[in-house]
A protein has these predicted regions:
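Positively charged, small/polar-rich N-terminal and surface patches that mediate targeting and assembly
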Residues: 1-86
Length: 86
């Protein structure tokens, strides 16, 4: 999925964090799962495209999709992200 986000110019960078262990309630049951956390560096205009892509390709019925808007970022980095996703 990370490669597809980059190849499709939906994200400039995707960080993959393995070893995430989640405990949650689903359909009335307590579930425990090993998961992988993906963080995609992109722009706000790509939110709908990225969330739609993940909903189609993710094995979960309800994947966690959260956007964090940066309070500040280095200008050259921001320009690089913008150039990679257009």
């Amino acid at each position: 999925m990370a490669h597809q986000l980059i190849e499709g110019q939906l994200a400039a960078c995707v960080q993959i964090q393995e070893g995430v262990y989640s405990i949650y309630r689903w359909d009335g049951k307590i579930c425990e799962e090993k998961e992988v956390l993906l963080s995609a560096k992109t722009i706000a205009d790509k939110w709908i495209d990225i969330s739609s892509f993940i909903k189609i390709h993710h094995p979960y019925d309800l994947p966690e999709l959260i956007a964090h808007a940066p309070e500040k970022y280095e200008a050259h980095y921001g320009k690089w992200v913008e150039s990679e996703v257009k």
